[in-house]
Amino acid sequence: MNFTCKIYHSGGFFTTARSLYSTLCHDVYARDMAVIPHFTRSSSADDIASALTSFGCVIIDELVDHQQVEALLSEMQPFIDATPLGQDDFTGRTTQRTGALLARSAASIDMVAHPLVLEVTQKILGLSATTFQLHLTQIISISPGAPAQPLHRDQWCFDFFEFPAEMDVEISTIWALDDFCELNGATRVLPNSLMEPSSAVTQTDRTVAAEMTKGSVVMYTGRTIHGGGANQSTAVRRGLNVDYILGWLRQEENQYLSCPPEIARTLPENVQRLAGYAIGAYALGYVDDVRDPNAVLNGRDGGSSFGGLEINTPNLA
């Protein structure tokens, strides 16, 4: 893959650019520039969340090691090979979308539940909900010759409901399982598009390729206009798409069938809860006699409580 993405390996250019982007993300004038702020694995969640809510997108460079990526691909390759191509232009007629990663790959947990990603997500989604949950897990394999995906907003999956303009209901991530560059179909994003009208999806000339090295991750919000890039290289471009949503919204990937109880109970408890085996709000997701789903999953009684939260009744006087 290196021959398609030489920008990352020539003359220290990427290191210099990454430093520049990291500086720009703290510069008020960068708001008007078509760049994606870059961060490192040692950056603070506060700084990343601030840039994400300002620009709508950030890249955290080399957040996991190549060995972690290779472990994931080794476990998932048989499932990728068996995945059919998409049946429409949006899904991608030369693109494979392979899901159910929690059930199929132990190595996926390194990325699906990465502490820094979850901390950033909590800082943003925590403003609008008691909890957040996993929305989907999917390896996207874009074959050579694939055209660019139509631009869109991820939160349109909620029946195109018009949420309040400044409200974030979803945080999306795409992990680079190969080096991402414009030539091989790096995800294209429209920086500063959070408040843009929906008609901006036609402005493909304003998009920027999320170029990054293997093991890096691009994060963007449900309001950010973006789309998969055209793969003009000779190799498949692979990325891991993991999205998170508010605890009171429906998940795109049905985790309870994709990762059923007999598999879910083998996962770490924080991952079980992230997948949705938990109370989503004080009265959402309980089991039978108002029992906590995580307790039931793990063979505990679970009591009888609407989440154990104190409910503050609005003052309607």
Regions found by a protein language model. Give the residues of each.
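Conserved double-stranded beta-helix
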Residues: E196-M219, R223-T224, G229-A317
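Short Ser/Thr-interspersed hydrophobic loop/turn segments at strand-loop and sheet-helix junctions
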Residues: I140, D179-F180, R223-T224
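Non-heme Fe(II)-dependent double-stranded beta-helix
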Residues: V28-S54, D61-D159
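Fe(II)/2-oxoglutarate
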Residues: M1-S54, P314-A317
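Residues that flank catalytic or metal-binding motifs in active/ligand-binding sites
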Residues: R97, R104, H135, V169-I171, ...
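A structural signal for short, well-ordered beta-strand segments
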Residues: L136-I139, T173-W175, L240-Y244
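A structural signal for well-ordered alpha-helical segments within the folded catalytic domains
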Residues: P115-E119, I171, T213
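Catalytic core of non-heme Fe(II) oxygenases with the double-stranded beta-helix
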Residues: A146-M212, L249-C259
